[in-house]
């Protein structure tokens, strides 16, 4: 293939360039368009161009060269390009070619000068913006600098074009074309200058009209709508600025008014936008970007080009949605604040209910998983771990006991209790007590022991118990199924029922506690009384309790098979307007059997004694969790009725055999006060005595219960001994009066001892065995499911 071109004074002959490039891999060749400009063709790849076998090349500008008739051959590539100087004596063939290509010559000459200039010149010729036009899109600081450089290049080119037009006037036939181009350039992508139109002629005019009609076909139709839209937008922005709110559009939208230059740069652009006469021109807002902006940024792709022309519609739609949202918000603001508060409270209530439901479901699922894991376990050591893990779970979440019972936990535990491993048996007894499963009572019915509060006067109750032990020849914890105490009675209940201490040791310990605690200086006690409302040191009392009882929990005492059910009573003073009784138990209630009294078994033993003995004026009130505890004697100094209720919850089908109520002595004065008035001290004493009265409960129970069921032992003292008495002679006096009272009521004591010594009948033993097997195998043994 051969190409013969006659351009001005030089001709270039390229013989079979495809073969040469493919074989010799030529890198570049130089093409001289004029004696002062040199262009080089750089080989890129063997791609298809206009001709199916033509090599695509890239044209780049190089330095100026002068060429004559010679052969330019790139080194080591073998590409020969013939360059011949033409003259009037040129061959005929070349003259014909020159005549035929005259029109192509003129067209290519104008195209080469207009198109193949520098990048800034090309951009300036394609993007002759009006001084008042602005492109609304986000740019960085470097982008603004680039725009400023482009504007400077435009100004320099304008000056150059003005000078060139003065030197070479435009023909008259082209004047109307230039005027028409100036009018169209205000609203077109291509902005015509005199230099370009003069050189291009009709070809450039046709090309520019085609591009402008393609890219800006709908601009005139939507211009009015866009102007009205952006006018509304500016009004909305003004309102938001007044309200102190900042509005910003989506960063993905190129044509956004939210991103504006700083005041300095905006001031500079306003100065530059003024007309030569000094009057500022109006700045119409254009939502579309011209093709020159995308040519100046070669890294941007087709998506940016398309987005620049359709992006003008997005802000309008976005602002319409915002205006609708604002219209909907206006009636909502007019609603009263009370309804909003109600909705907020309802939402909080619903969220709390949802959280509770989710928590309850998770607790139930965890309980089921632990029970099923225990039922699948056969190894005794692993069973101990499973049982203890389930015990801790139920202590933390008592509401899971019902699910555990439904999952047939009790039969599994009863079968495990038959194993000979003592550790496993102790763990099983603890979790059975926690669930509320109890063994049958020891005697023919329920046997209850209750001890009143009274400080160191509790030695009187010890004298009564000593006589019962002497008559029955059994320790206290074997005589009774349930032991309950208040204040000092709780101390005796724990020592006798939980620690199984002998009576002599209990009396010695009782005297020592009295001397250690109640030996307080009067002056120091008075100061403490005014400061903490406690005459004695509560911290010392807590320290003694921790040393004696340790950190064991109440429920852990159920591991001992000989341990009866034990409870200590305190009074909660911060729940509601009236005090409420609180029961510290070493057992739990079976699911479905609800007690009327508050309480729990997850507390430590020393905490139960500390709360139950917090007598006002003697010891400071004790805070345990969210509750504030005081002495239980403030509400129930005689806990017999409470003990009966608790026993009925534990053994609902068992009869009540015996209730032994032990008092700490009472004092009855024969002195009569004035009948006209009473002193303030007397009034306060009457209130306290009525609150701590034990005889009214005794009278009521004695009249309601069957004969030989309720036995009350409370001796009358010849002297009113205070609660904090620690002198040994006074304590000896109390013991002596207690012994005299027992001697006077020896017949009554023998009756109680006889009832407590009765054994179960054969029929009761058979019933207990059947019940145990039924619970163990979920039915009668011969109808068992296993």
Swiss-Prot record:
Glycans are attached at residue 4. It is a single-pass membrane protein. Residues 449-644 form the PNPLA domain. PROSITE patterns: PNPLA. A motif (DGA/G) lies at residues 631-633. The keyword Transmembrane helix applies. Residues 158-180, 225-285, 321-348 are annotated as: Disordered. The modification N6-succinyllysine is found at residue 740. Residues 225-245 have a biased composition (Basic and acidic residues). Its EC number is 3.1.1.-, 3.1.1.5. One of its GO terms (cellular component) is peroxisomal membrane. Residues 246-258, 266-285 have a biased composition (Polar residues). It is an enzyme of class 3 (hydrolase). It catalyses: a 1,2-diacyl-sn-glycero-3-phosphocholine + H2O = a 1-acyl-sn-glycero-3-phosphocholine + a fatty acid + H(+); a 1,2-diacyl-sn-glycero-3-phosphocholine + H2O = a 2-acyl-sn-glycero-3-phosphocholine + a fatty acid + H(+); a 1,2-diacyl-sn-glycero-3-phosphoethanolamine + H2O = a 1-acyl-sn-glycero-3-phosphoethanolamine + a fatty acid + H(+); a 1-O-(1Z-alkenyl)-2-acyl-sn-glycero-3-phosphocholine + H2O = a 1-O-(1Z-alkenyl)-sn-glycero-3-phosphocholine + a fatty acid + H(+). The chain crosses the membrane at residues 483-503. Keywords: Endoplasmic reticulum, Glycoprotein, Hydrolase, Lipid degradation, Lipid metabolism, Membrane, Mitochondrion, Peroxisome, Transmembrane, Transmembrane helix. The keyword Glycoprotein applies. A motif (GXGXXG) lies at residues 453-458. One of its GO terms (molecular function) is phospholipase A1 activity. Expressed in kidney, heart and brain. Calcium-independent and membrane-bound phospholipase, that catalyzes the esterolytic cleavage of fatty acids from glycerophospholipids to yield free fatty acids and lysophospholipids, hence regulating membrane physical properties and the release of lipid second messengers and growth factors. Hydrolyzes phosphatidylethanolamine, phosphatidylcholine and probably phosphatidylinositol with a possible preference for the former. This is Calcium-independent phospholipase A2-gamma. It comes from Oryctolagus cuniculus. The gene is PNPLA8.
């Amino acid at each position: 293939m051969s190409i013969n071109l006659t351009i001005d004074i030089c001709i270039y002959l390229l013989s079979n360039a495809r073969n040469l490039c493919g074989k010799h891999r030529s890198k570049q060749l130089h093409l001289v368009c004029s004696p002062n400009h040199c262009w080089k063709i750089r080989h890129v790849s063997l791609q298809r161009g206009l001709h199916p076998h033509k090599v695509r090349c890239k044209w780049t500008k190089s330095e100026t060269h002068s060429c004559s008739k010679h052969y330019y051959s790139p080194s080591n590539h073998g590409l020969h390009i013939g360059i011949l100087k033409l003259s009037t004596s040129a061959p005929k063939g070349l003259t014909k070619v020159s005549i035929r290509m005259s029109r192509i010559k003129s067209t290519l000459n104008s195209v080469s000068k207009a198109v193949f200039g520098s990048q800034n010149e090309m951009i300036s010729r394609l993007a002759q913006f009006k001084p008042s036009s602005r492109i609304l899109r986000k740019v960085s600081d470097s982008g603004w600098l680039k725009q400023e450089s482009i504007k400077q290049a435009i100004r320099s080119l304008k000056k150059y074009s003005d000078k060139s037009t003065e030197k070479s006037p435009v023909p008259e036939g082209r004047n109307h074309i230039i005027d028409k181009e100036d009018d169209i350039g205000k609203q077109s992508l291509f902005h015509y200058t005199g230099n370009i139109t003069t050189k291009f002629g009709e070809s450039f005019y046709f090309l520019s009209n085609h591009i402008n009609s393609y890219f800006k076909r709908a601009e005139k139709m939507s211009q009015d709508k866009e102007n009205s839209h952006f006018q509304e937008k500016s009004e909305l922005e003004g309102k938001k600025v007044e309200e102190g709110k900042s509005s910003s559009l989506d960063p993905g939208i190129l044509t956004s008014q939210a991103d504006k230059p700083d005041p300095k740069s905006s001031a500079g652009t306003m100065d530059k936008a003024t007309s030569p006469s000094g009057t500022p021109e109006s700045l119409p807002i254009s939502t579309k970007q011209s093709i020159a902006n995308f040519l100046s940024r070669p890294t941007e792709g087709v998506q940016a080009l398309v987005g620049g022309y359709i992006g003008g519609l997005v802000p309008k739609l976005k602002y319409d949605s915002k205006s609708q949202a604002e219209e909907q918000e206006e009636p909502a603001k007019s609603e009263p604040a009370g309804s909003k508060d109600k909705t907020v409270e309802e939402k909080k209530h619903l969220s709390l209910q949802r959280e509770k439901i989710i928590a309850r479901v998770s607790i139930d699922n965890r309980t089921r998983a632990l029970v099923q894991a225990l039922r699948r376990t056969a190894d005794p050591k692993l069973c101990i771990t499973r049982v203890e893990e389930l015990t801790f779970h139920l202590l933390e979440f008592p509401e899971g006991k019902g699910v555990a019972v439904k999952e047939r936990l009790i039969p599994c535990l009863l079968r495990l209790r038959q194993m000979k491993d003592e550790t496993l048996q102790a763990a099983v007894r603890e979790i059975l007590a926690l669930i509320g499963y109890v063994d049958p009572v020891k005697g023919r019915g329920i046997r209850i022991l209750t001890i009143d509060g009274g400080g160191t006067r509790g030695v009187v109750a010890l004298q009564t118990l000593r006589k019962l032990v002497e008559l029955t020849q059994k320790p206290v914890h074997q005589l009774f199924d349930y032991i309950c105490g208040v204040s000092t009675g709780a101390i005796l209940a724990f020592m006798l029922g939980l620690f199984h201490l002998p009576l002599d040791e209990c009396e010695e310990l009782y005297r020592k506690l009295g001397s250690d605690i109640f030996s307080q200086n009067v002056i120091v006690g008075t100061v403490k009384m005014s400061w903490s409302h406690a005459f004695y040191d509560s911290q010392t009392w807590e320290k003694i309790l921790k040393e004696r009882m340790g950190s064991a929990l109440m429920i852990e005492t159920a591991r001992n098979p000989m341990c009866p059910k034990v409870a200590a009573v305190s009074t909660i003073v911060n729940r509601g307007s009236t005090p409420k009784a609180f029961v510290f138990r070493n057992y739990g209630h079976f699911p479905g059997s609800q007690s009327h009294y508050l309480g729990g078994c997850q507390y430590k033993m020393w905490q139960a004694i500390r709360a139950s003995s917090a007598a006002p004026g003697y010891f400071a009130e004790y805070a345990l969790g969210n509750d504030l505890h005081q002495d239980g004697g403030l509400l129930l100094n005689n806990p017999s009725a409470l003990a009966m209720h608790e026993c009925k919850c534990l053994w609902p089908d068992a009869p009540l055999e015996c209730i032994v109520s032990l008092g700490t002595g009472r004092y009855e004065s024969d002195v009569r006060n004035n009948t006209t008035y009473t002193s303030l001290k007397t009034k306060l004493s009457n209130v306290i005595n009525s609150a701590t009265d034990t005889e009214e409960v005794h009278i009521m129970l004695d009249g309601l219960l069957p004969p030989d069921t309720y036995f009350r032992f409370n001796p009358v003292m010849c002297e009113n001994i205070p609660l904090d008495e620690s002198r040994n002679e006074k304590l000896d006096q109390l013991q002596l009066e207690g012994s005299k009272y027992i001697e006077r009521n020896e017949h009554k004591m023998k009756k109680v001892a006889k009832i407590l010594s009765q054994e179960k009948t054969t029929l009761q033993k058979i019933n207990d065995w059947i019940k145990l097997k039924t619970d163990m195998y979920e039915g009668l043994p011969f109808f068992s499911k296993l």
